[in-house]
Amino acid sequence: MSEATVWSDLPGELLDHIANGLFSKVELLRFRSICKTFRSAVDSDKNFLDHLKRNRRRLLSPYSTGKTCSLSPAAFYRVVLSSYPDKGWLIKLQDAYVSSQKQLLSPLSRFSIKSSGKTLDLLEFTVSEIHQSYDVEYLYYNSTRASFNFARVVLAEDFVFIVDNYKKIWLCNSNESDSHWVRIMDEEVKLFSDIVFHKGYMYALDLTGAVWWISLSEFGIFQFGPSSTPMDYCDIDECKDKRFVEYCGDLCIVHRFSRKFRIKRVDIDMTVGFKVYKMDEELVEYVEVKSLGDKAFVMATDSCFSVLAREYYGCLENSIYFTEQNNVKVFKLGDGSITNMVDSSFQSCFQMLIPPLV
């Protein structure tokens, strides 16, 4: 029989390392309540510098409107009951503008959720940050803020990169409020569908599915890997969108394809499936990922990432969650079917505080 761990005997260096990974006052309170040694190791007024730097709002130089704009961070959290940590919910929060409170957002979009009137005792829950996303907003009439609704916004070190609505990549230095936005492009390729900061490097995805590397020192852009990802379905369906997703440490490319349907005399473009590709380093080509195993992809409007399905209520493994026409839908890679979340009888990981709507 193995010996029980004596928490008070853990070395101070390890406790300090653990404390530096905390991101909220609630986590700090729970950490310090374990034993006297833990309380002595970390002050109750500890600042979360890394978290604050990553999550703070930043004033940016004016974009096309000529009006003041800012970087607006949001974070995805996994919330579980401390008494039952095996399964949980996915929520999305950002700092409120005029107070120290948090504002609840719809998980798969940035729409604000009005207060439900519920009060949660956070000491009964364990909250873990799992992913970060960003938006760029501008100030207009009556001090109201609005989003530019860029296709993607990424913070890499102190540089803000965006893919605008015309599929152009721009960047500015968030530390210099008078820094002008600079366009990133190649002589041959000027339009892109996505960008990502992955393992310390900045990558861009062009409209053909080719990956490009962006230098953070010179801001040049260079092709990385094969010239494109497969497009073997283009004779039947239109590739509606292409996105990066980090999956098991690899950078995958997700193709979302659609088809036009005529409903009530109106042509409607609807998603009919997804294909996932990853780089085969030996073959130096992209190969299709037929199964996500026990993972699921979350394709939010401002960020895409993978989760371990069994850690969330009602989350189906080997599936892709996305939004369409103000509904949350799930695509199953196993049989290629698409289901509305509102039609599901299962408890949803998005339903902790809100209905399963965008």
From Swiss-Prot:
<comment type="pathway">
    <text>Protein modification; protein ubiquitination.</text>
</comment>
<feature type="domain" description="F-box">
    <location>
        <begin position="4"/>
        <end position="51"/>
    </location>
</feature>
<dbReference type="GO" id="GO:0016567">
    <property type="term" value="P:protein ubiquitination"/>
</dbReference>
<protein>
    <recommendedName>
        <fullName>F-box protein At4g35733</fullName>
    </recommendedName>
</protein>
<dbReference type="Pfam" id="PF00646">
    <property type="entry name" value="F-box"/>
</dbReference>
<keyword id="KW-0833">Ubl conjugation pathway</keyword>
<dbReference type="InterPro" id="IPR051304">
    <property type="entry name" value="SCF_F-box_domain"/>
</dbReference>
<dbReference type="InterPro" id="IPR005174">
    <property type="entry name" value="KIB1-4_b-propeller"/>
</dbReference>
<dbReference type="InterPro" id="IPR036047">
    <property type="entry name" value="F-box-like_dom_sf"/>
</dbReference>
<dbReference type="Pfam" id="PF03478">
    <property type="entry name" value="Beta-prop_KIB1-4"/>
</dbReference>
<comment type="function">
    <text>Component of SCF(ASK-cullin-F-box) E3 ubiquitin ligase complexes, which may mediate the ubiquitination and subsequent proteasomal degradation of target proteins.</text>
</comment>
<dbReference type="InterPro" id="IPR001810">
    <property type="entry name" value="F-box_dom"/>
</dbReference>
<comment type="subunit">
    <text>Part of a SCF (ASK-cullin-F-box) protein ligase complex.</text>
</comment>
